[in-house]
Amino acid sequence: MNVYEGSLVATGLKVGLVVARFNSLVTEQLLVGAADALRRHGVKDGDIDVFRCPGTFELPALLRRVARSARYDAVVALGAVIRGGTPHFEYVAGEATKGVAQIALESDCAVSMGILTCDTLEQALERAGVKAGNKGAEAAVAAVEQANVLREAAKVPSPRRAE
């Protein structure tokens, strides 16, 4: 049995962070956590690019463009959707999640999702580093691991076909 896993060493990786500006109190903390995690795992500052879009709904379109640029080993989506009194939350959260998932399937680079979907601002802040760790950092580390396992998978030889 052959087992392929991605390492958490990010030296030499180029990463695009795509960040929604809406709910910036939360998303800026996700960005800080993601960038810090990337640096701690070996990514140089010059190999981290940050792209900003208006909100989480718009995030997949920019994420797709960045992922398709072929300049990055990994891209990370960072956003926050906080429930309000209307069904708007479900639409934005659902479509953003579907969009990121579709990009992950279509892309040759690693795609990671650090989009918070929370009932309250307090929950979002907790997940952005106040209490429950930083989900931006977790998404960045997942992107590193995925980028490395994708590299390993690309090296696996094709099976020989019986003639």
Swiss-Prot record:
Residues binding 5-amino-6-(D-ribitylamino)uracil, per UniProt: F22, T56, F57, E58, A80, V81, I82, M113
Give the UniProt record's GO annotations in the biological process aspect. riboflavin biosynthetic process
Q: What keywords are assigned to this protein?
A: Riboflavin biosynthesis, Transferase
Q: What highest taxon heads this organism's lineage?
A: Bacteria
MF terms in GO: 6,7-dimethyl-8-ribityllumazine synthase activity
The record, for CDD domains, names: Lumazine_synthase-I (cd09209)
Q: Which residues form the active site?
A: H88
What EC number(s) does the entry state? 2.5.1.78
Pathway in which the depicted protein is active: Cofactor biosynthesis; riboflavin biosynthesis; riboflavin from 2-hydroxy-3-oxobutyl phosphate and 5-amino-6-(D-ribitylamino)uracil: step 1/2
Class in the EC hierarchy, top level: transferase
Annotated positions binding (2S)-2-hydroxy-3-oxobutyl phosphate: G85, T86, R127
Q: One GO CC annotation, please?
A: cytosol
The reaction(s) catalysed by this protein are: (2S)-2-hydroxy-3-oxobutyl phosphate + 5-amino-6-(D-ribitylamino)uracil = 6,7-dimethyl-8-(1-D-ribityl)lumazine + phosphate + 2 H2O + H(+)
Record family assignment: Belongs to the DMRL synthase family.
Please give the PANTHER family that the UniProt record associates with this protein: 6,7-DIMETHYL-8-RIBITYLLUMAZINE SYNTHASE, 6,7-DIMETHYL-8-RIBITYLLUMAZINE SYNTHASE DMRL SYNTHASE LUMAZINE SYNTHASE
User: What does the protein in this record do?
Assistant: Catalyzes the formation of 6,7-dimethyl-8-ribityllumazine by condensation of 5-amino-6-(D-ribitylamino)uracil with 3,4-dihydroxy-2-butanone 4-phosphate. This is the penultimate step in the biosynthesis of riboflavin.
The name under which this protein is listed is 6,7-dimethyl-8-ribityllumazine synthase
- The gene name on file is ribH
